[in-house]
Amino acid sequence: MAPASTPRTVLPIPDIPKPGLTTFDAKDPDTSYPPIEPLRPPEGAPNVLVILLDDVGFGASTAFGGLINTPVADRLAKNGLSYNRFHTTALCAPTRAALLHGRNHHSVGFGMVTEFATAAPGNNALVPNTKASLPLTLKYNGYATSMFGKCHEVAPYLASPMGPFDAWPAGGVGFEYFYGFIAGEANQYDPALYEGNSPVDPPKSAEEGYHLTEDLADKAIGWIHQQKALMPDKPFFTYFSTGACHAPHHVPKEWADRYKGTFDAGWDAVRDEIFERQKAQGMIPAHSELPARHEEIPAWEDMPDEMKPILARQMEVYAGFLEHTDYHIGRVIDAIEEMGALDNTLIYYILGDNGASAEGTMNGSFNEMANFNGMASLETPEFLASVIDDFGSPDSYNHYSVGWAWAMCTPFQWTKQVASHWGGTRNGTIVHWPAGIDAKGELRDQFTHVIDVAPTVLEAAGIPEPQFVNGVMQSPYEGTSMCYSFNDGQAPEEHDLQYFEMVGNRGVYYKGWSAVTKHRTPWDLVGQPPPFDEDQWELYDGSSDFTQARDISSENPEKLAELQRLFLIEATKYNVIPLDDRASERLIPELAGRPTLIHGNRQMLFAGMGRLSENSVVNTKNKSWSLEAKIDVRESNATGVIMAQGGRFGGWSVYLDDGHLCYVYNTLGIHQYETRADTRIDVGEHRVMFEFAYDGGGLGKGGDVTLSVDGAPVAKGRVEITHPMIWSAEETANIGRDAGTPVGSYSISDSVLTGADIHFVELAVGDDSADHEIDPMERFRLAMKIQ
């Protein structure tokens, strides 16, 4: 342990040699050096486990009055504290960046998700070096640090296997160990995983019972066991950030079946039931009012009868997904308890990084990629009914209806993305620390925010905020430690001023009052939003209106004006200004002012390259293009992928099958268009080519396929429908193999190229692109869904 006098405001702690006698011979009896002491935090510093779920609304969990069983959250709440006024930013990456840095999301460059980054300081997705992360601070103070799960704080141009890794968890963020994914969402059965900065495959397949949440728990338990076995006197900081319950809602059928019939009455009735449970549980004041359903959300009774069983099943699957997640979180906590370390482990269990996701359309979806590509009409009620038993399975990439998201945000208005209202930002949070909190099973209603976590952890550990990190002077934390509330439920709230903003949805909280304005509805992206000055502001008195049910702006215009001015002051202070609700401009790197990896219309790739995101590969959608590969065929029955992009839910692959050159185009997992040469390729060196002649005339059209060997055509084929917008949210491109889920009918294990070697692969796109025909709002809608 570092001496008590060691200053911890300069990190890393400087090495200061102790003056003393220097002898010539080490055998001299006057030779003396102080013993080497490993760096440790102050005595008694707790272990820290921060759990962050994804896309879980305030009203989902039984811990906060919901219908979805979360016995682990319930157990922690019974022995700890429940915070019913804890807030996030209303969106994924901004919440995560704010959590890990103790500063507002715009202060650390995350006014929006990384795909929308601009050159503006509040939206560039680049954390300034003046705002060091919590894990880095803890590591420099002697903590062991680890992260498991989702990281969406890496800009697309930094997310290739070549980094640079400054923004990666195991790079500059400060985690000594990372196991998880770098994206906004993941296929729970076939995720694109990283260990440290290196891509790795899941340890087993979906058919063998793989699920990401279970895997994350296994890895976390293993790491904690090893850490305590080898360094028992060193506390750990573990960040367990699940991909659940973000879509796709993947969970084994038996978990979803636990909720058979629970949601048959529909979202209106479910919302009413949750509201009454919340009041009975004391989670919200007894006098609370339930805000009326907005007209943008259809009533359950107005949904077609043939859709209701499908919609109910969507919610059953989501419920099973959340309970399954809670169960595996319990395994991690049980492992800590079995080692005798639970009493001095500070646990934050944050049930959601924002409100529930209303990005699944009114009907929900079986394969989100259909909606992402503007092809939701392919998922007819008849189709959805035919796959109702497959929701949540490896064959699905599913999401639930907007109506369920609204119900899961009970008792508040709106959902994820809507930073103006509590439905987007208020997330139930549990704090458990037996050694530091005497109170058990109590409610805390002080206003708190995700930026309060970092200062709380430092105070609990007895570590000061650093003034310098890596030679750079630090700006102070913008959050407030919650420790004052741990053992005093009546303590006045210390975090009494907070702005909120996301794509123009904005507001401010000050000493019980909130002034808010919704600028954009998450699922209504037709046309441009109104000018900011025309937004209608609302005013709520939180002392008597917990749920923001009664807008009193017309009764108290002076108070509204006061808070509007306060919002502008805070927005200016924290880089929120200029407000930015642009759509297509922010998705085009050149217009947004951010770098891009890919330039020009050609790209050379080589054997062994893989885990390339769509941002790492030239865009071949809505245009003619070709692939040419130089290969050395060693065996006449050579088999495997030359190059593949995407997976089961959409993509393409050029491959060899028993020596035959083949191509497959997979449209949404619904249609597979295959082209196959009749003859084998001779042993020897060859140039093989795939050419796609796009029909033109719009987006997502078909085209003619030609396969050639050494310039001679060997097969022709046809693709009728193509993806206009995206292959996948997290599947990748790979050379010499397929990865994740297979594009074609081959298995992943059989996709590895054998009997042939690849010298290079070159992609070339034509000049007939129809990308300019993509509606800017469609681009915006797509990007907002994948976060």
Locate the predicted segments by residue:
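Hydrophobic alpha-helical segments
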Residues: A460, F546, E570-K573, A764, ...
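Formylglycine-dependent sulfatase
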Residues: M1-D533, W537, G542, F546-R565, ...
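Middle-to-C-terminal accessory/interaction subdomains
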Residues: L560, L568-L587
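Extracellular glycan-associated modules
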Residues: P578, A583-Q787
